[in-house]
């Protein structure tokens, strides 16, 4: 997948509005929290978080996506610390209060396990993880995401990956989403919100 090519198209591939999941769950985030939006794309989620008053940093590996994200932030009149980076290159030693990871299912099982380990490292004690993506049946729907069931999430997988964390919300459901041309139609979805132990 060449994300720079995908994001070079005119307009916003996933729209300008935040993911419906994030709109529903953002109230859990403490005011003024240090938030990291992972593989943020064109900025729809990070910009929304900044409008809520959070200290937001975000990264994506696509030059075109980051440029569009900066334009979206300027349009909204907010500041986001945008960075050009992939998950593997990001400095996870600088802890944040909240990690937001939405539709990052371009990784297979091995890379995903490494990413989840980075999340466990990069989140401050007592911090929140807001994770949202597709369930394996999404491959049959074909309305977004890669055509690889092994890249998708299940709730047992996520409970295992973040064992010992307090699960605040989890759901496995189908819904009609309209989030730009990239995510459009009936979809098999997973929500997972958990708090890292404070100790």
Short names for language-model regions:
Residues 1-30:
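Conserved class I S-adenosyl-L-methionine
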Residues 62-64:
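Conserved SAM/SAH-binding beta-strand->alpha-helix loop
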Residues 69-70:
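Conserved SAM-binding loop
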Residues 75-88:
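Conserved SAM-binding strand-loop segment of SAM-dependent methyltransferases
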Residues 90-98:
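A short acidic, Gly/Pro-enriched loop at the edge of an enzyme's catalytic core
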Residues 106-119:
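A short, conserved alpha-helix within the catalytic core of class I
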Residues 126-134:
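Conserved beta-strand signature within the Rossmann-like core of class I S-adenosyl-L-methionine
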Residues 150-171:
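Short alpha-helix
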């Amino acid at each position: 997948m060449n994300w720079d090519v995908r994001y070079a198209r005119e307009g916003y591939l996933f729209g300008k509005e935040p993911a419906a999941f994030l709109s529903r769950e953002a109230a859990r985030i403490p005011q003024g929290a240090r938030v990291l939006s992972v593989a943020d794309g064109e900025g729809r989620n990070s910009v929304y978080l900044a409008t809520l008053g959070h200290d937001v940093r975000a990264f994506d590996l696509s030059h075109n996506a980051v440029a569009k994200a900066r334009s979206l932030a300027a349009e909204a009149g907010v500041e986001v610390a945008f960075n050009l980076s992939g998950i593997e290159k990001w400095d996870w030693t600088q802890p944040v209060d909240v990690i937001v990871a939405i539709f990052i299912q371009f990784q297979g099982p091995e890379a995903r396990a490494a990413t989840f380990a980075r999340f466990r490292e990069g989140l401050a004690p007592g911090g929140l993880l807001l994770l949202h993506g597709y369930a394996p049946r999404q491959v049959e729907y074909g309305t977004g995401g890669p055509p690889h069931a092994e890249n998708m999430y299940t709730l047992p997988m996520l409970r295992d990956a973040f064992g010992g964390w307090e699960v605040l919300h989890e759901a496995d459901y189908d819904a009609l989403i309209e989030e730009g041309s990239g995510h459009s139609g009936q979809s098999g979805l997973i929500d997972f919100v958990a708090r890292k132990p404070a100790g």
